[in-house]
Amino acid sequence: MSARVAYLGTSIADWAGELSSRDPLQRRLGAYALGEIGPAATEAASDLAAALQDPIGFVRVWAAAALAGVAPPSGESVTVLIAELGDELAFVRSLAAWHLGRLGPAFRGIEQAILPLRQLAGDEDPSVRVEAALALGMLEGKGAPPPELKSLST
């Protein structure tokens, strides 16, 4: 792996190595950093793909988001993010919705996320409902926040 491209002074190889750390926060940080490097970190795509099987939901979400920015669009990231919309932890569901929205309407396979995001309108956690509504607004090309959020700003 290339030592020339770095994020915060750490090489792609070292960030990819963090994906194997015993500490889930380090694994999440490795995924985040590789995502920040973006397409220049394509050599870490297989490491990120392996991290999609991580036992910790938030690590899978960050790995999927990073893979979407590092590798050519394949739909694999969308599949993982959609699966995480059903995680038992509200912050993982919210984070997955956030990332789905930011992939944008042109991302390959994103149309599969519309129905699951709509189903989150009834989620018991308000942060999940808000992120799902924002993601839908971004993916459906409306630009403005959806009407469901109006009550939160008044």
Cite the ranges covered by each PLM segment.
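Amphipathic alpha-helical scaffolding segments comprising HEAT/armadillo-like alpha-solenoid repeats
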Residues: A6-E18, P39-Q53, P72-G86, F107-A121, ...
